[in-house]
């Protein structure tokens, strides 16, 4: 009896293996080269159109002037970021992963390309899950913008992008994206570097790791921003879908937002309806020389304006090196250059559950600035960066100073603690700082 069962199990496993092999065998490899020679396609889009689900498309070195739209699971593999070039001059995007018009789009890989000169985003990942964007150079996109102030934000941009004024989508935009991995890319010369937003659907569980995001002058290096749902109109914007549970890790983010004012890493809600940017992690990044603080969390609406509060809860800022960034402005202003700014503006949306820990902050006038009617926890940080280690800046924004900053167990630059000779200071009310660390953590 046991032998018979074993034989049957072996046969079932073998049959399953054959089935799996048969399924894998249907995936084909297609090729593209500029000449269309050797049975290859001359255009990337032609190969994409011909591909079946799970096919691999190898793109040879050369320049391809096109706007590639992908609506099926496949792998698009270039010869290297400086070899296979998608030049999207006067075209909307270099690459669009279009899950809005292809519901259920998943498991698309893009690697080994330069994507440049698009009117809007170089790469747009739209309503897609499980995409991998790795080892690309995304440069000099957003050529139609940036546009600020009144009037059309980004002329001709699709209706599903509800609030891209200033960056026209950025170099790489994850819009309604889930479980995306963005790794090892270089983004420079765009309006901003990487944008995650929720205009068309919730954006969650995405990982940005090991990217170099530099010299994107008009907006942030990396920004997680909650925008109104498409179809929602003022004055009664619908609740936003949310930008949640994303991880921004081990990126080099420098010299962004220097012409207009952009953070190294931004956690924002745009002030048009109740937004949600919550439970995200900013960890082990280098955030230096950006136009406004290295990490900036902004909310602009709330009870003080008779409006529902934004949900900016549960964000964590951990183990980053932050140095030489600029001051914040407008309704989230800080008195000078700032490392981290947690700011509800005048709207009074409480920012609950913020954790700031293990960061090293240098060359700032204010290391950590806070304005929110909730408790913010900042522990185990090296606050030797500036004259003020922790500041409660609520009075600067005419907000109610009802929040608490728990800044115990930080190193303030010397063993004798804050507000002593040679140590960083505190500024403002409701700051706890005892006990402190006598040496860096």
Model features per residue range: what roles?
Residues 232, 305, 330, 335, ...:
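Functionally critical loop-and-helix segments that line ligand-binding/catalytic clefts
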Residues 19-46, 50, 61, 79, ...:
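Right-handed parallel beta-helix/beta-solenoid
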Residues 10-21:
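Bacterial N-terminal signal peptides
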Residues 88-101, 117-126, 147-176, 189-203, ...:
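Extracellular beta-strand/beta-solenoid scaffold signature
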Residues 45, 49-52, 64-77, 85-130, ...:
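Extracellular beta-strand-rich solenoid/capping regions of secreted or surface-exposed proteins
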Residues 59, 79-83, 113, 136:
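Extracellular beta-strand-rich, repetitive "passenger/adhesive" scaffolds
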Residues 37, 55, 62-63, 80-82, ...:
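Acidic glycine-/aspartate-rich tracts in secreted/extracellular proteins
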